[in-house]
Curated annotation (Swiss-Prot):
Keywords: Cell inner membrane, Cell membrane, Electron transport, Flavoprotein, FMN, Heme, Iron, Membrane, Metal-binding, Transmembrane, Transmembrane helix, Transport. HAMAP family: MsrQ. It comes from Brucella canis (strain ATCC 23365 / NCTC 10854 / RM-666). InterPro entries: Fe3_Rdtase_TM_dom (IPR013130), MsrQ-like (IPR022837). GO terms for biological process: protein repair. Its main location: membrane. It is a multi-pass membrane protein. NCBIfam families: PRK05419.1-5. It is found in: Cell inner membrane. Binds 1 FMN per subunit. Binds 1 heme b (iron(II)-protoporphyrin IX) group per subunit. The lineage of its organism: Bacteria, Pseudomonadati, Pseudomonadota, Alphaproteobacteria, Hyphomicrobiales. This is Protein-methionine-sulfoxide reductase heme-binding subunit MsrQ.
Length: 220
């Protein structure tokens, strides 16, 4: 009897997939460069704190870029939705590296000291909450989760707004005074959140602002 053989269809990469990989590659360049600066003694008098700070700063930057996708589309018509998931995941990876640096290099895996910091130092508490909120977003940033969760997926990913607000507050509270840098980032975050609140009203006035679908946070 002749055995029936099935033919497997080879998965062909989607058009423009290389752009996503290029984005991921470029996204990790700051981490590699910062690690190089630290390894070669170019991060100043307190390299651990500087390394930790820069990783956290890049996490906030990528969160801002993630939320900028929608205003850019609304105001210019340029659609970057396919890159939003990658930007959101990069933000999570940097936030995780930021916390890992604090936990391993700063505190030396002293769990008692880490827990004490989280409980007693408000800016660390807020930072930890923000990181915790990003975890389910990163874990569900895939097509399977979108299909499985349905409408709940969009509701879940609205947590990104709380996470980015907490990240901005964490940055502001981590400095003894308020220099320009954290204030500028906080202002950008505030503007993005205000845009999100005003967007439904703007869409009723300008039909062009109505997107085909509401993609939140880390979704492609």
């Amino acid at each position: 009897m002749a055995a029936a053989t099935g033919t497997r269809k080879k998965k062909t990469p989607r058009p423009g997939q290389w752009k996503l990989w290029l984005l991921y590659t470029a996204g990790f360049v700051p981490a590699v460069w910062t690690f190089y600066l630290g390894a070669t003694g170019q991060l100043g008098a307190d390299p651990v704190k500087t390394f930790e700070h820069l990783l956290g700063l890049w996490a906030l930057r990528f969160l801002i870029l993630t939320l900028l996708v929608t205003p850019i589309r609304d105001l210019t018509g340029i659609t970057l939705l396919r890159y939003r998931r990658a930007l959101g995941l990069l933000a999570f990876y940097y936030a995780l590296m930021h916390f890992t640096t604090y936990m391993v290099l700063d505190q030396g895996l002293n769990l008692s000291a880490i827990i004490t910091d989280i409980v007693r130092r408000p800016f660390i508490t807020i930072g930890m909450i923000s990181l915790a909120l990003l975890v389910p977003l990163a874990l569900t940033s895939n097509n399977w989760s979108i299909r499985k969760l349905g409408r709940r997926w969009s509701s879940l990913h609205k947590l990104v707004y709380i996470a980015i607000a907490g990240s901005a507050v964490h940055f502001l509270m981590s400095v003894k005074s308020w220099p320009a840098e954290p204030v500028i980032y906080a202002a950008i975050v505030a503007a993005l959140l205000l845009w999100r609140l005003a967007r439904p009203y703007l869409r009723t006035r300008k039909p062009a602002l109505r997107p085909r679908g509401e993609a939140i946070a880390l979704r492609k």
